[in-house]
């Protein structure tokens, strides 16, 4: 007959079974400093074993994260950030839907620094925030996060920030998050990878601005000035961009960009010119009343199975022969190419670099749909527009 014990082995009663999270982060750090880890990269502990600390609103964020690493927030309480929170080690913040309110002078609410030397815990490889709601108060217009180490945001909600929500110079992953009425949700300044999946951007000015490689997939952007300003390259797939205004109405509010050393009007999706980079992979996207700018790069720009309904495509000089729309659905699409500038008509606009630039009016010329098939010769009832199961 199995013998009852308190170690959670077979035969123990449910009341006496031990939970996995019985090791505190302080004990793990002490074990690491004692030299019992045979190797720095040895993952002796996993996420489920680390005891979580239920944080109180009056606790010091910097100290609690350094001491406990695995933090739980109370959804019935409100957590107010009055000064910058410094994070220098891997941690895991479980929000449970709790509100984190940022007040005070403009600055940085959370500053993720370069990680210090410490233990490696399985499934706690980065700074992670999950199920947190971030709000601002008292006209706070600073940044929410600046990240110098890898950070993961999972199912978080940012609302009403007039500054940049997340600025990163390291690998960044944003999954299942929502950004409502934010000026710039994501600004990626690293040469690493940016991953944004299953997110919602509503009523934002510049949703994603990236200088590095990216994978942006399965997102929804509505009523925003710019969804993606891409100076780098990567994968852009399965996204939906919906603008409730017509192209004439959206022209009343416009911004510019100087990312490619030329001041251009900022489009909903803006692929900057760079002769050293290839075009991003552009697949299975739906654009409704959106603006797409295609700069000059290496190779060709061939959107696959994208719906470009009542949208505007602007081609930079030298890129008009690089675009192929033969596998798209361009109903109501208008295509223009940049001809020259009118020096007699100058205007000043706010730039995505947060400065204001004066530029000459750009003269555009309307062109036909580039590289589309002849409907009298090429049938759409073919393998190109079908799945494997249909053949």
Swiss-Prot record:
Classification via Pfam families: Adeno_E1B_55K
InterPro entries reported in the protein's UniProt record: Adeno_E1B_55kDa, Pectin_lyas_fold, Pectin_lyase_fold/virulence
SUPFAM superfamilies: Pectin lyase-like
GO CC annotations, alphabetized: host cell cytoplasm; host cell nucleus
Keyword DNA-binding tagged: no
Phosphoserine carried by residues: 387
Domain of life: Viruses
GO molecular function: ubiquitin-like ligase-substrate adaptor activity
Major localization listed first in the record, in broad terms: host cell
Cellular compartment(s): Host nucleus; Host cytoplasm
A GO BP annotation: symbiont-mediated perturbation of host ubiquitin-like protein modification
Keywords per UniProt: Early protein, Host cytoplasm, Host nucleus, Host-virus interaction, Modulation of host cell apoptosis by virus, Phosphoprotein
Subunit structure: Interacts with host PML-4 and PML-5; this interaction promotes efficient subnuclear targeting of E1B-55K to PML nuclear bodies. Interacts with E4-ORF3 protein. Interacts with E4-ORF6 protein.
Entry's free-text remark on domains: Contains a PML interaction motif that allows the subnuclear PML localization.
Biological role: Plays a major role to prevent cellular inhibition of viral genome replication. Assembles an SCF-like E3 ubiquitin ligase complex based on the cellular proteins ELOB, ELOC, CUL5 and RBX1, in cooperation with viral E4orf6. This viral RING-type ligase ubiquitinates cellular substrates and targets them to proteasomal degradation: TP53/p53, LIG4, MRE11-RAD50-NBS1 (MRN) complex, ITGA3, DAXX and BLM. E1B-55K probably acts as the substrate-specific adapter of the SCF-like E3 ubiquitin ligase complex.
Family membership: Belongs to the adenoviridae E1B 55 kDa protein family.
Protein name in the entry: E1B 55 kDa protein
Species, as recorded: Tree shrew adenovirus serotype 1
């Amino acid at each position: 007959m199995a013998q009852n014990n308190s170690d959670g082995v077979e035969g123990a009663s449910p009341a006496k079974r031990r939970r996995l999270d019985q090791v505190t982060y302080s004990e793990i750090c002490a074990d690491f400093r004692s030299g019992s880890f045979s190797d720095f990269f040895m993952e002796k502990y996993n996420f489920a074993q680390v005891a979580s600390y239920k944080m109180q609103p009056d606790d010091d964020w910097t100290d609690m994260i350094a001491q406990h690493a695995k933090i739980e927030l109370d959804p019935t309480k409100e957590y107010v950030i009055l000064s910058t929170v410094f994070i220098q080690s891997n941690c895991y913040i479980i929000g449970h839907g709790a509100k984190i309110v940022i007040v005070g002078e403009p600055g940085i609410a959370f500053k993720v620094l370069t990680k210090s030397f410490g233990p490696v815990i399985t499934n706690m490889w980065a700074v992670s925030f999950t199920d947190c709601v971030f709000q601002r108060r008292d006209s706070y217009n600073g940044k929410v996060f600046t990240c110098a180490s890898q950070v993961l945001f999972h199912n978080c909600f940012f609302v009403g920030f007039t500054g940049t929500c997340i600025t990163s110079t390291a690998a960044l992953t944003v999954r299942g998050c929502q950004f409502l009425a934010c000026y710039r949700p994501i600004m990626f300044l690293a040469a690493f990878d940016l991953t944004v999946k299953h997110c919602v951007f509503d009523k934002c000015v510049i949703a994603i601005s990236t200088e590095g490689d990216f994978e942006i997939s399965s997102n929804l952007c509505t009523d925003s000035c710019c969804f993606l300003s891409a100076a780098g390259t990567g994968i852009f797939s399965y996204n939906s961009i919906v603008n409730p205004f017509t192209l004439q109405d959206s022209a009343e509010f416009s911004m510019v960009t100087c990312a490619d050393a030329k001041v251009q009007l900022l489009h909903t999706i803006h692929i900057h010119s760079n002769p050293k980079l290839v075009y991003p992979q552009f697949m299975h996207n739906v654009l409704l009343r959106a603006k797409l700018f295609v700069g000059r790069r290496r190779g060709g720009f061939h959107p696959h199975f994208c719906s470009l309904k009542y949208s505007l495509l602007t081609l930079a000089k030298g890129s008009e022969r690089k675009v192929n729309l033969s596998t798209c659905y361009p109903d109501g699409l208008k295509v223009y190419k940049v001809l020259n500038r009118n020096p007699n008509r100058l205007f000043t606009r706010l730039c995505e670099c947060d400065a204001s630039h004066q530029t000459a009016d750009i003269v555009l010329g309307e062109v036909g749909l580039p590289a589309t098939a002849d409907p009298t010769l090429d049938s759409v009832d073919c393998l190109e527009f079908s799945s494997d199961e249909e053949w």
